[in-house]
Amino acid sequence: MAPINGSRNGKHSKPQRGGNLKRKRVQEDLNSLIKKVEDLDVKETIEQFTDLPLSEPTASGLASSHYKTLTDIQSRAISHALKGRDILGAAKTGSGKTLAFLIPILENLYRKQWSEHDGLGALVLSPTRELAIQIFEVLRKVGRYHTFSAGLVIGGKSLREEQERLGRMNILVCTPGRMLQHLDQTSFFETHNLQMLVLDEADRILDMGFQKTVDAIIGHLPKERQTLLFSATQTKKVSDLARLSLQDPEYVAVHEAASSATPSKLQQHYVVTPLPQKLDVLWSFIRSNLKSKTIVFLSSGKQVRFVYESFRHMQPGVPLMHLHGRQKQGGRLDITTKFSSAQHAVLFATDVAARGLDFPAVDWVIQLDCPEDADTYIHRVGRTARYERDGRAVLFLDPSEEKGMLKRLEQKKVQVERINVKANKQQSIKDQLQNMCFKDPELKYLGQKAFISYAKSVYVQKDKEIFNIKELKLDEFAGSLGLPGAPRIKFIKGDDTKERKNAPRATAYLSSDDESDEEGEKKKTKKDETQVRTKYDRMFERRNQDVLADHYHKLINDDGTMVETNKATEDADEDDDFLSVKRRYEAGDKDLDVGGSSSEDEEDADGTEKKGAKVVHLDGKEALVIDSKRREKLLKSKKKLLKFKGKGTKLIYDDEGNAHELYEMEDEEQFKAKGDAKEQQAKFLAEEAERTRQADLEDKEVAKQKKREKKEKRKARERELLAMEEEGGDLVQIPYKEGGLASDEDEEVLRPSKKARVSFADEASEEEPKPKKAKKSQPAGKAPEQIETLEDLESLAAGLLG
């Protein structure tokens, strides 16, 4: 008979047999795959993905995503990674480095039969959020047939939602900052079982910007792991490799022997243009290339915002977008998506978009500001000419930057050709920018911040052969932005300290006199009413009254004119600090001691007190002199009057009522006059012992007296009870108080302890509460009885006893 659940046992059990066969077949395929990987020759050049020893889910994902042919970096790196070796991979931009580490991640975890119960198996670190999103999208396409759980952990999203899902992830793609936050704050997130660590754009992650963060992350990870590093400009520093605990890494540099570090189909040019003409040349370029897809790189986010807002108002005829690190994550993602799908557009961006991002069909890469080094240049131009496509790049250089930058590019095998701008095609937009800044104070403020951020980006660079802020025409550059004058730049010290020190004193004295004269003229009324004032003069003199008024006021001179670059104004700028001393106090100043009276109010020049001053003595060493209204206010402040009051003394009083100090000490001479110290000690001990004995006797006598009184009260109560029994009267309970029988006065005090009941009966009924009290004293549950004889009393006592 078959079981209740309908299943069969014995030789006809087909489902169980089929399950065993399937598990056996999967295990055989896994063993075969492991053997193929072990037999793989890393020196062999593999061109097709079908020739690699890959699992069925990975092969199906590659075929569905239309990946068929391997690139050079993929052919050389995947073989070493499948065997579990650490890799340092360096290849040109757009050469397919992402698949070179994603395929080994999927395969190594698949061969180990990784599941959600095993925890985190692979961690991929990316320097930017956009690159992390791009890596995650490729992982989703290639690993769609695997059963692994993958997650994206970047800033700008809800931390709590990420914490809830983090414990179930097998593969994580993240940015360093958010990953460290989870390692420190998410309690159930464990990384002790990590198998692979991947650093994309490793040179950027390992530099000074992420050094502390990456060191902290590595401190949470196990040392026994496989580490893969990929970048277009790879690091070989021993210190960096030691931090990552690399074990005999394999250096895979595909294009190390190539003649150029950039893609072969990339056309690279540079234009020497003065700093004040950069925006004019950029505008002319955009107007002449409306049917192109262009990325324009600038050095700071404030420059990106200003150029985007100003060009957007002028409407060049092509869609404009901007991308920088201060934008919210949702906005950044929308912009990257729109620019990727756009056919013709211009994207103004910082170096956030310089690494790893794959924007399809980018025609031009314009570097409006000089990159900080040759590696940054390589990554910027790598946004075009990807995957063997054509691309063009143009670098804008100031004459002071040309020689040093070309030297750095030659050291990195980067060859750039110089081109000239046709003067007849160049358009000037200086007047348009001035008009917009005049009408829009917010755009004017944005231009001032853009100017300061550019100057700061040049000032902080270490390579002074390229970046020398003293050789830049900053005043003319401010005018090209539409600003009425160059904003203050407090971090630029102007001339050297040695030059200022050797300058003649007369020059500094005259400049200080001129400044004081100018300040005096400000206080006077305007006398030059007949002078003609144009609308531009009024524009420069007006003050903003909107939300940006305070910020705008900090960026210009107090008179609204442009900042002059002479020594006097530079010294004045140095004195105009964020914190200024309102009043300086010296040691011994009476204002500081007493609370703020001026020296003129206190004393005359000869040190005598003023006439009519009042002197108040408050039992202190110093008398209070009241010679001004400010001093008179001291009388209302108890805290400030404490200085003029003497210190209080604590007194005790003896039995006779005489006051004594708390501690009355004898002089040394008086003490010696009384005799030897040991004799005085023995005498004192004897006196104290006698005093203690007498006090003990008195206490014992008091205790005996209390005990005697208590005994007498108890006997008096017993005698009273016996007398009542002999008389045969009613038994009345006498109130008992601790220590003896209660007196008549005690009874009177005890009786009104309960509130008298309010009764509406007649007066006769109000006189009957006394016998009721006697009845209440009887035991509960028994009716009161009249005791007439001794037998009745004995029977009542027997009943009470039991």
From Swiss-Prot:
Q: Where does ATP bind?
A: 91-98
Q: Which GO terms describe its molecular function?
A: ATP binding; ATP hydrolysis activity; identical protein binding; RNA binding; RNA helicase activity
| Major site of localization recorded for this protein | nucleus
| Subcellular localization | Nucleus, Nucleolus
Enzyme superclass (EC): hydrolase
Which keywords does the record carry?
Answer: ATP-binding, Helicase, Hydrolase, Nucleotide-binding, Nucleus, Ribosome biogenesis, RNA-binding, rRNA processing
Query: Region labeled Disordered — which residues?
Result: 1-24, 494-538, 589-614, 685-802
Q: What is its EC number?
A: 3.6.4.13
Keyword flag Nucleotide-binding:
yes
Q: Where is the composition biased (Basic residues)?
A: 9-24, 705-714
* Cellular component terms per the entry's GO annotation: nucleolus; small-subunit processome
Task: State the CDD domains in the record.
Answer: DEADc_DDX10, SF2_C_DEAD
Domain Helicase ATP-binding residue range list? 78-252
Helicase C-terminal domain residues are: 274-437
What is the residue range of the motif Q motif?
A: 47-75
User: Which parts of the sequence form the motif DEAD box?
Assistant: 200-203
Q: Which GO terms describe its biological process?
A: rRNA processing
Amino acid composition bias (Basic and acidic residues), ranges on this chain: 520-538, 685-704
Its recorded reaction(s) are:
ATP + H2O = ADP + phosphate + H(+)
Q: What does this protein do?
A: ATP-dependent RNA helicase required for ribosome biogenesis. Involved in the release of U14 snoRNA in pre-ribosomal complexes. Required for pre-rRNA cleavage at site A2.
Give the record's family classification. Belongs to the DEAD box helicase family. DDX10/DBP4 subfamily.
Q: What remark about domains does the record contain?
A: The Q motif is unique to and characteristic of the DEAD box family of RNA helicases and controls ATP binding and hydrolysis.
What is known about its subunit structure?
A: Interacts with the U3 and U14 snoRNAs. Associates with pre-ribosomal complexes.
What is the recorded name of this protein? ATP-dependent RNA helicase dbp4
